[in-house]
Each structure stands twice: as C-alpha cells, then as structure tokens.
Amino acid sequence: MTASVLRSISLALRPTSGLLGTWQTQLRETHQRASLLSFWELIPMRSEPLRKKKKVDPKKDQEAKERLKRKIRKLEKATQELIPIEDFITPLKFLDKARERPQVELTFEETERRALLLKKWSLYKQQERKMERDTIRAMLEAQQEALEELQLESPKLHAEAIKRDPNLFPFEKEGPHYTPPIPNYQPPEGRYNDITKVYTQVEFKR
C-alpha cells in the first residue's frame, strides 16, 4: 500500500519534459538516495542474496538418526564404569614368572663379617633382655614388699592400693626403638611428581 502511494506521488511530481525529468531523477537518486520518494528502490539493495538450498537426502538423514538412536541405547544398556582402584591392580611386570633377582655371590671375607656381626647383635639383644627381666623382677619384689608393709600398717589403705584402676586401659606406649632418635632432626621435604590419574564418574539416568 505504501509503495503504491509513493509511486503515484513520484509520477505526479515528475515534470513533462522527458530529458529534464530524467536529469532530475538521476540527481535525486544520486544526492537524495535516502529520500521517501526512492524508498522502494532501497529495499532490494539492502537485502541479502539468496542462498542455495542444500539438497537433503531423506534416506541418509533417517539413517543418521537411527545410528544416533542405536548409540544412545547402547550407552544406556551398558553397565556403569567404576573408577579403578590402582592399589588393588597388580602391574603386569610383577606377574612375570621369569622376573627374578640375580643371586649375588658373596666373598668369604664378607660372609665371615656378616656372621660375626650377627653373633655380636644376638649377644647384645640377649644381654638387653636379661637386664629388662632383672629390672622387672626387682620392681615386682619391691612392690610386694611395700604392699606387705602397708597391710600391716593399714588394711584399708592396702585394699585401696590393690584395687583395679580402670584408667590404665587402653594403654598406649611408643617404642621401644632399636635406634636412638636424632635430636632436633628436620626431615627433608623432597620433590615429587603427582601422577595420580583423575577419573570422571559418568552416571546414566535410566
């Protein structure tokens, strides 16, 4: 409706002289391209060229949809993949039966040195246990002697002394250590590479 009205107005305003009208029309189209009288000429110039439509084969489209549906059904039927616990997985290199450490042949001097060292260590531990037994025996004898003296002095205190103490258990003790601790020892902070694998748990909604 608007285009027809503008076209009629343009024809009414166009002069009778053909040459003059053509010159004025060219002048108007050149310098007043955005005027209302040339509005219908701007619409085709602002539009985009038509794109060529792709021919879609309905058979191929249907096959692609069917493949996608089959893939979705397969994923839904599959059991949920659990995150593996690497601590319970034995590496294959440790399952090889032929993997054995070569036997080291010791010299006669090294064998004698180790045997003598083992004898000295056994003698040291034997003396240590003998000293511990003697110490415990002396403590028990002193305790029994003190209880007998306490019973003669006060039977009531003796009954309280031999009563079981519920706070003694559970008993916790650290040691004994085979090597003495190093005073003011600061353990070194070593460098390490974190090679822990990160797994993403995928859950399917059924």
From Swiss-Prot:
<dbReference type="GO" id="GO:0032543">
    <property type="term" value="P:mitochondrial translation"/>
</dbReference>
<dbReference type="GO" id="GO:0005762">
    <property type="term" value="C:mitochondrial large ribosomal subunit"/>
</dbReference>
<dbReference type="GO" id="GO:0005743">
    <property type="term" value="C:mitochondrial inner membrane"/>
</dbReference>
<feature type="region of interest" description="Disordered">
    <location>
        <begin position="168"/>
        <end position="192"/>
    </location>
</feature>
<dbReference type="GO" id="GO:0005730">
    <property type="term" value="C:nucleolus"/>
</dbReference>
<feature type="transit peptide" description="Mitochondrion">
    <location>
        <begin position="1"/>
        <end position="46"/>
    </location>
</feature>
<dbReference type="GO" id="GO:0003723">
    <property type="term" value="F:RNA binding"/>
</dbReference>
<protein>
    <recommendedName>
        <fullName>Large ribosomal subunit protein mL40</fullName>
    </recommendedName>
</protein>
<keyword id="KW-0687">Ribonucleoprotein</keyword>
<dbReference type="InterPro" id="IPR039145">
    <property type="entry name" value="Ribosomal_mL40_metazoa/plant"/>
</dbReference>
<dbReference type="GO" id="GO:0009653">
    <property type="term" value="P:anatomical structure morphogenesis"/>
</dbReference>
<keyword id="KW-0689">Ribosomal protein</keyword>
<dbReference type="InterPro" id="IPR019192">
    <property type="entry name" value="Ribosomal_mL40"/>
</dbReference>
<dbReference type="GO" id="GO:0005739">
    <property type="term" value="C:mitochondrion"/>
</dbReference>
<keyword id="KW-0809">Transit peptide</keyword>
<dbReference type="GO" id="GO:0005634">
    <property type="term" value="C:nucleus"/>
</dbReference>
<comment type="similarity">
    <text>Belongs to the mitochondrion-specific ribosomal protein mL40 family.</text>
</comment>
<dbReference type="GO" id="GO:0005761">
    <property type="term" value="C:mitochondrial ribosome"/>
</dbReference>
<keyword id="KW-0496">Mitochondrion</keyword>
<dbReference type="Pfam" id="PF09812">
    <property type="entry name" value="MRP-L28"/>
</dbReference>
<comment type="subunit">
    <text>Component of the mitochondrial large ribosomal subunit (mt-LSU). Mature mammalian 55S mitochondrial ribosomes consist of a small (28S) and a large (39S) subunit. The 28S small subunit contains a 12S ribosomal RNA (12S mt-rRNA) and 30 different proteins. The 39S large subunit contains a 16S rRNA (16S mt-rRNA), a copy of mitochondrial valine transfer RNA (mt-tRNA(Val)), which plays an integral structural role, and 52 different proteins. mL40 binds to the major groove of the anticodon stem of mt-tRNA(Val) in the central protuberance.</text>
</comment>
